[in-house]
Regions:
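A short, active-site helix/loop in glycosyltransferases that binds the activated sugar's phosphate group
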Residues: 35-51, 196-228, 301
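Conserved active-site histidine-acidic residue motif and adjacent donor-binding/catalytic loop
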Residues: 140-147, 293-297, 312-324, 338-339
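Short acidic alpha-helix that forms the nucleotide-activated donor recognition element
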Residues: 152, 317-329, 348
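Short His-centered aromatic/hydrophobic patch
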Residues: 164-170
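Catalytic binding pocket for nucleotide-activated donors in carbohydrate/polymer assembly enzymes
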Residues: 334-401, 405-406, 410
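N-terminal subdomain of nucleotide-sugar transferases
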Residues: 2-131
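Conserved catalytic-core segment of nucleotide-activated headgroup transferases in glycan assembly
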Residues: 89-100, 211-305, 314
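Acidic donor-binding loop of glycosyltransferase active sites
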Residues: 157-162, 326-339, 351
């Protein structure tokens, strides 16, 4: 089935209507689920950045499910960090956690869910004597049963500041944050600056990690400029044992690596796949490995059509991501959505970066992430020049090493 824009918009509008109808019938859990579905649609297809209808519905659900305190006195240097999904080396959790620990205040970390994939982060929290961890129990979308519990947990802790690390569809958390006393200052940690998310109305300030996000939040999300704080982040270089590469990655092969959620390479008239095809067809010694989650259908179809079964290989999620970069030769940036953290890992490890974007999209160039204070150009605006550069990097080891060191020296943050 071909997903047309008209069909996507009709599904979105229908889901919003179902959310409103459920609310009017007092079925708040169901209303919240429809809100989250609508948010996921908007996030996946990325035609809007804010929806005040959904924001208003969340605020109304909050009023119906939470009894607010009449008086509240915050305690300074007491903070809450709310994490929707905790995974090591993903998002900006560890960066902000370390910053809050450095403030030497009391810290309550609230997590919707976590497992062994968050072992390093949990260890850091437990090692800090002033920190507590609270994991939500049951279904986090059960607003009727759990919203009041979470509200009471936060208010009883009496924080002065709340830091929100959310998913685009974190409707449950936002219903609680909407009800919090105004004495608590809410900071949104925006790890999804390129797409839609819920929560524009419940923040006091928003942390952006690059100028592009500042522009989107001001112009598209309609957030006041005075509330937007630019704070670049750095990759967390945890050591993990290398999990290895597929057997086809023999010593005579040049390993290109690419990574990020798979939606980042869909769209853009299929240009990412055209670039990959040109590189692999012109350079038989090259193999492309891709680490990331998402809908694999489009990638698998591309692999089968071009008989790339041993040359374009999906790795899934890799916790040893820094080791992956150490063992690859070249990093190929995603398109049409460029990944920030992956580019930083490449730069820190001295791997040359191949990045493309349209000339008119300079706000999305990766230079804003790894070369802020240096006059260096990494992003290509001509696909042909990029593939030519790829060929030279693949065939000339000395040049490849030189380019990797050059970008690290000129601007990559360590």
């Amino acid at each position: 089935m071909n997903l047309t824009k008209e069909y996507i918009l009709s599904c979105y509008d229908k889901t919003k209507r179902l959310a409103k109808k459920s609310f009017e019938k007092g079925r708040y859990n169901r209303s919240l689920k429809y809100i989250n579905i609508a948010a996921r649609i908007a996030y996946q297809f990325n035609w809007i950045y804010r929806d005040d209808d959904l924001e208003e519905l969340l605020a109304n659900i909050s009023k119906q499910t939470i009894s607010k305190r009449n008086h509240y006195t915050p305690i300074e240097n007491r903070y809450v960090l709310y994490v929707a999904s905790m995974i090591d080396n993903r998002g900006e959790i560890q960066q902000y956690l370390r910053a809050l620990i450095a403030c030497e205040g009391e810290l309550l970390v609230i997590v919707e869910k976590y497992g062994k994939e968050a072992a390093a982060t949990i260890a850091e929290i437990k090692a800090y004597p002033k920190a507590k961890i609270y994991a939500l129990q049951g279904d986090e979308t059960d607003v009727e049963s759990n919203a009041q519990k979470l509200y009471d947990k936060i208010v009883n802790f009496r924080p002065s500041k709340l830091f929100m690390h959310l998913r685009p569809e974190s409707g449950f958390a936002i219903t609680v944050f909407d009800a919090l006393p105004e004495e608590i200052i809410n900071y949104q940690i925006n790890l999804t600056d390129h797409a839609f998310w819920l929560g524009c109305k419940c923040l006091d300030y928003i942390f952006e990690f690059r100028p592009y996000g500042c522009t989107v939040s001001q112009e598209k999300r309609k957030i006041d400029k005075d509330k937007i704080l630019l704070l670049p982040y750095y990759p967390i270089l945890n050591h993990r044992d290398f999990q290895g590469f597929p057997s086809s990655c023999t010593a005579d092969k040049i390993i290109l690596f690419s990574g990020g959620e798979l939606y980042k390479i869909y769209g853009g008239n299929g240009l990412y796949f055209k670039i990959v095809k040109h590189i692999l067809d012109e350079n038989p010694q090259a193999i492309l490995l891709y680490a990331g989650d998402g809908d694999t259908g489009g990638v698998n179809a591309f692999i089968a059509e071009n008989k790339y079964e041993n040359r374009f290989i999906l790795l899934g999620f890799r916790q040893d991501i820094n080791e992956v970069f150490k063992h690859c030769d070249i990093y190929l940036c995603t398109y049409p959505s460029a990944g920030g953290l992956m580019c930083q890992y490449a730069a820190v490890n001295g791997k040359p970066i191949l990045a493309y974007n349209e000339p008119k999209a300079r706000s999305k160039f990766i230079e804003d992430l790894i070369c802020v204070n240096a006059n260096v150009q990494l992003t290509f605006t001509d696909p042909k020049r990029l593939t030519e550069e790829a060929g030279r990097l693949i065939t000339d080891k000395t040049y490849r090493k030189k380019q990797g060191k050059k970008q690290t020296k000129k601007g990559a943050r360590k």
